[in-house]
UniProtKB/Swiss-Prot annotation:
Localization of this protein: Bacterial flagellum basal body
Biological-process GO terms, alphabetical: bacterial-type flagellum-dependent cell motility
GO molecular function, one term: structural molecule activity
Disulphide bond pairs: none
Membrane-crossing residue ranges in chain numbering: none
HAMAP family found in the cross-reference section: FliE
Highest rank taxon of the organism: Bacteria
Name under which the protein is recorded: Flagellar hook-basal body complex protein FliE
Keywords, comma-separated and alphabetical: Bacterial flagellum
Source organism (scientific name): Pectobacterium atrosepticum (strain SCRI 1043 / ATCC BAA-672) (Erwinia carotovora subsp. atroseptica)
Family stated for the protein in its record: Belongs to the FliE family.
């Protein structure tokens, strides 16, 4: 292979490297991780509470099609999800305190 052939290949490689560096890297909009999962769980608890509040309000106003048993089930779901969220928070705080008390 001649020197001119190698120079041509080298030039092509440099052009490709420049093109690659100009191309933005596509990153996922939501990076999977603990923080995003925790936020999703908290949002779900909030949504459950909002649905229960809305159902209770509709029942109180006498909107047709809203039964008392549906309202009670939604309120219980909301209560249980909130209790679970509190327990998870307590475990997280406990784990954080345990890690902070470790000697290095």
């Amino acid at each position: 292979m001649s020197v001119q052939g190698i120079d041509g290949v080298l030039q092509q490689m440099q052009v490709k490297a420049l093109q690659a560096s100009d191309t933005p890297i596509a990153r996922p909009s939501v990076e999977p991780g603990f923080a995003s999962e925790l936020k999703a769980a908290i949002d779900k608890i909030s949504d459950t509470q909002q649905v229960a509040r809305t159902q209770a309000e509709k029942f109180t106003l006498g909107v047709p099609g809203v039964a008392l048993n549906d309202v009670m089930v939604d309120l219980q779901k909301s209560s249980i999800s909130m209790q679970m969220g509190i327990q998870v928070r307590n475990k997280l705080v406990s784990a954080y305190q345990e890690v902070m008390n470790m000697s290095v």
